């Protein structure tokens, strides 16, 4: 089974999530929650992570983490492994605690509102789960970073960074007035919950430019053993680029493909290049180049590989 590729680079921001094995609790009591936070603090000390938001639920957690050193993978391996060992030791258990590999969505953190969307989602998670009654303030749920945003600096852990989120809310200073304004805006956001624009789906949250930059990194890093939506999208983007490059060189537009024979030598040559340089299926290649049935394309490519491309067919 293909492993999911983890794209790491200095300054990357991720929304990290993981659930208990078989959706069972990963915290038996508040002592376990404190144990997890202590382990997270150690992980941040080792990795220099900066955490923008976190929330501990019964059988899963959310973490919005920035990695100045581009080291999400070793940090998460340490965090999950050490917490599992400590949990098992405390409860005299053994075996897996978490369900498979954690999910990590890339988040564009350059001030376009994406970091705010993710952190708001994390801080409002207890509301969606029914853990905060309608008459209670949001900070009454103590197992998230939100109450710490409303505290002064001495009460916060060093690894919690609040300035970025406050800035995206348009709050320039981490002051009593700024924190009061933040609380008011979050309560208003809570009342509007249900119309939010962010859901933790896919593999990244950001602008199209940000997505394309990530896909370029994936294209450079990916190996045949890698899997995941970002790898599939990177492969698709590469194949589309090659196909368009070939059409431009021939002076063809996409409709020209439909008007040419399915076995046109140039189509076969382009198909061979796509087959050689990408991981796209014969189905995709046949559809993109208007070459008909997959079996027909496979036969054409076999003949092409046996005789080799002629000088008239070779453009590059």
Predicted regions and their residues:
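Short Pro-Cys-Gly-centered "Cys-loop" motif that presents a nucleophilic cysteine in a tight turn
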Residues: 1-57, 66-316
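N-terminal functional module of multi-domain proteins
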Residues: 62-64
């Amino acid at each position: 089974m293909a492993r999911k590729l983890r794209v790491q680079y200095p300054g990357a921001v991720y929304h990290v999530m993981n659930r208990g094995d078989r959706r069972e609790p990963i915290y038996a009591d508040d002592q376990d929650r404190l144990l997890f936070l202590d382990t997270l603090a150690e992980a941040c000390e080792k990795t220099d992570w900066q955490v923008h938001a976190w929330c501990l639920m019964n059988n899963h957690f959310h973490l919005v983490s920035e990695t100045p050193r581009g080291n999400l993978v070793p940090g998460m391996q340490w965090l999950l492994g050490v917490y599992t060992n400590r949990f098992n030791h405390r409860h005299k258990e053994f075996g897996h605690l978490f369900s498979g590999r954690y999910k990590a969505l890339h988040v564009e953190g350059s001030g376009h509102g994406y970091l705010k969307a993710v952190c708001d989602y994390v801080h409002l998670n207890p509301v969606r789960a029914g853990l905060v009654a309608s008459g209670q303030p949001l900070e009454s749920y103590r197992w998230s970073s939100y109450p710490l945003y409303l505290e002064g600096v001495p009460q916060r852990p060093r690894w919690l960074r609040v300035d970025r989120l406050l800035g995206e809310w348009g709050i320039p200073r981490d002051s009593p007035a700024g924190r009061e304004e933040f609380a008011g805006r979050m309560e208003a956001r809570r009342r509007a919950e249900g119309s939010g624009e962010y859901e933790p789906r896919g593999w990244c949250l950001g602008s199209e430019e940000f997505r394309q930059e990530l896909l370029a990194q994936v294209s450079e890093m990916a190996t045949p053993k890698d899997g995941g939506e970002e790898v599939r999208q990177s492969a698709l983007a590469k194949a589309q680029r090659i196909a368009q490059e070939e059409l431009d060189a021939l002076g063809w537009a996409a409709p020209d493909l439909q008007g040419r024979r399915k076995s046109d030598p140039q189509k076969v040559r382009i198909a061979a290049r796509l087959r050689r340089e990408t991981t796209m299926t014969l189905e995709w290649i046949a559809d993109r180049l208007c070459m008909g049935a997959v079996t027909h394309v496979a036969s054409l490519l076999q003949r092409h590989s046996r005789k080799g491309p002629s000088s008239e067919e070779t453009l590059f």
